[in-house]
């Protein structure tokens, strides 16, 4: 699917994506003005709760309590995050096999093995990965990977809803050349934005990607009542319910790889369903788009 894309996009915050030659200016991570989530182990954190649901080890009692409340509200949430993870591994293997060597993971969360850099390095040991998150615990974990001598990994502090400063901060690492094809990952983050904002944000990012770039998106789709309950349970973030039509619209201007937007459990490159995929409450919808 294709559509006209604006040449000077703005983020939901009104930031114009500009810079020399029309590209975002290099902005040091500390200068983005992005609000950070303060580290407090006595308060629940969604990234650490997610890590717990995936079987990770970087969490505290309040995070496990939050995860327990989420499971009580919607017992399928653990399966959802695991479906998302399995899809991401398949998607990254596919993209890496196409020769993409640059990756930007928006709202990365705590690294879970296999992490993005571990997956893509199966195909190219020199692939560069920059992780973006607004949680200092996540950033510290990810930067520790680079501190171990990996010259092709970095992490920047950023609010994914503000494309201009995020793209500038990523560029400032020196690991990503926006003039070359990039794989942009937005996995399980767009349900924290309303549909209109999510469309604006994804359009702002994709409009500045080089031709041949790949965009991976996954979105948790549940019943509106469940999203409202989760919002009340975890008051640090609001969760929005997106329809299949919303998720398709996040790929506006991109060519979708078959089977297009589909249930993450069934998504495989080149697979084509004989009938429209059934929508079900509590599913993860996923897809990969390519820029022209």
Locate the predicted segments by residue.
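Conserved beta-strand signature within the Rossmann-like core of class I S-adenosyl-L-methionine
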Residues: 156, 182-186, 201-202, 208-220
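Rossmann-like AdoMet
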Residues: 1-158, 162-164, 168-178, 206, ...
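Short alpha-helix
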Residues: 238-264
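Short, glycine-/aromatic-enriched active-site segment of Class I SAM-dependent methyltransferases
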Residues: 222-237
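Core SAM-dependent methyltransferase catalytic element
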Residues: 267-292
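Short SAM/SAH-binding signature in class I
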Residues: 176-190
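Short "lid" loop at the C-terminus of a central beta-strand within the Rossmann-like core
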Residues: 189-192, 220-224
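Active-site glycine- and acidic-residue-rich loops that bind
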Residues: 159-164, 191-199
């Amino acid at each position: 699917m294709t559509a006209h894309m604006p040449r000077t996009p703005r983020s939901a915050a009104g930031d114009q994506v500009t810079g020399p030659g029309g590209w975002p200016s290099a902005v040091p991570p500390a200068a983005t003005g992005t609000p950070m989530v303060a580290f407090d182990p006595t308060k629940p954190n969604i990234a650490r709760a997610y890590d717990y649901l995936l079987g990770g080890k970087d969490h505290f009692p309040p995070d496990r309590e939050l995860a327990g409340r989420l499971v009580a509200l919607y017992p399928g949430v653990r399966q959802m995050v695991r479906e998302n993870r399995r899809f991401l591994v398949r998607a990254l293997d596919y993209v890496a096999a196409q020769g993409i060597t640059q990756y930007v993971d928006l709202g990365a969360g705590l690294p879970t093995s296999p992490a993005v850099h571990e997956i893509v390095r199966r195909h190219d040991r020199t692939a560069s990965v920059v992780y973006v998150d607004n949680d200092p615990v996540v950033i510290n974990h990810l930067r520790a990977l680079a501190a171990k001598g990996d010259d092709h990994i970095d992490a920047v502090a950023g609010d994914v809803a503000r494309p201009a400063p995020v793209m500038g901060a990523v560029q400032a690492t020196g690991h990503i050349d926006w003039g070359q094809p990039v794989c942009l990952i937005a996995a399980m983050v767009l349900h924290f934005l309303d549909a209109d904002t999510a469309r604006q944000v994804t359009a702002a990012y994709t409009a500045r990607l080089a031709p041949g770039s790949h965009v991976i998106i996954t979105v948790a789709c549940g019943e509106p009542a469940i999203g409202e309950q989760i919002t009340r349970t975890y008051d640090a973030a609001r969760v929005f319910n997106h329809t299949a039509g919303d998720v398709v619209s996040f790929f506006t201007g991109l060519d979708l790889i078959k089977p297009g937007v589909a249930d993450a459990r069934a998504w495989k490159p080149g697979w084509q369903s004989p009938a429209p995929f059934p929508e079900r409450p509590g599913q993860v919808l996923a897809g990969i788009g390519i820029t022209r």
